[in-house]
Curated annotation (Swiss-Prot):
This is Flap endonuclease 1. GO terms for biological process: base-excision repair; DNA replication, removal of RNA primer. One of its GO terms (cellular component) is mitochondrion. The keyword Phosphoprotein applies. SUPFAM superfamilies: 5' to 3' exonuclease, C-terminal subdomain, PIN domain-like. HAMAP family: Fen. Belongs to the XPG/RAD2 endonuclease family. FEN1 subfamily.
Amino acid sequence: MGVKGLNQLIKEHAPDAFKEYQLKNLFGRKVAIDASMCLYQYLIAVRQQDGQQLTSEDGETTSHLSGMFYRTIRLVESGLKPMYVFDGKPPVLKGGELEKRLLKRQDALKQIEDLKETGTVEELMKYEKRTVRASREQNDEAKKLLELMGIPYIVAPSEAEAQCAELARAGKVFAAASEDMDTLCYEPKYLLRHLTVAEARKMPIDQIDYEAMLKGLDMDRSTFVDLCILLGCDYCETIKGVGPVTAFKLIKEHGSLDNIVKWIQENPEKTKYKVPENWPYDEAKQLFMNPEITKGDEVDVKWNEPNVDGLVEFMVKQKGFSEERIRSGAEKLKKALKGGVQGRLDGFFTVVKSSPAKRKPDAKDAKGKGKKKAKR
């Protein structure tokens, strides 16, 4: 679900934290991608002309495999080095949110049955999107596909967003990539949004600089996490009637969520807000501040050459994809992975203070310097 209204608050109060990129601008960058979010997007977006999901001859959904295969190839062809992070076991505190989502899916399934006779395609699609979730089997299939493609992945101990942020913070990757704004609660160096859908929707990729965001909001990490909980997160409900503008104002006035709760409880005559009974906001904060993760320096990230025969066996013989297209995609991937070792230009140079002019290097010197390997 993410954090309600956070994106707009950052744009308003910390505009310098935002940068917009095209895919080509991220050439040479290593990125940790929230795999669960990707699978959800592909299950919704990758459809046949009649609006139905792609399926094999046996009727098994294959939209997630199509999206993961072709989108990953596109990322690698653009010079990125993607790795994926899958969700592990969800925190106990998230159970309430997951139960709400289940009820919404059940309600949507009922609406779909009612609309099958009289509803339009658009109406059916609206409710069908609410029923989408990646199953355990689909997650396992995506992992198998990535392994055959030579693309690294790991399974997080718990939340994938927290693990992506840790990898970015540890320098294993440049940024965490997810649509969930609560990734920022886990302190990534950078967050990339719309990375896996930007080209299809003709929209830019948003980069949020974590430190610039805190500076613009004039908050430390603890206060920022308090703000996110007050806005509404996956771990607990929020205070009814408190929207983004009010949440920001309350945090600025009182300094912390503890102080806000205390003020509301001690001054019921001065405010219309009521703190939810047994509100586990402090437990939610601890999950953000001290998430269950694998330390970045314990994670080995390596890209390998794709297993073409394995891809044909899995994607063509088992899942019914076109052999010509799978082989073509595998060759593109192989070529792009070999070409990706060039690195970024900013990995070759260090910015230094200006000094007295020196002679220009001749062509031979320039050629020699051009062969210097990037650090990363």
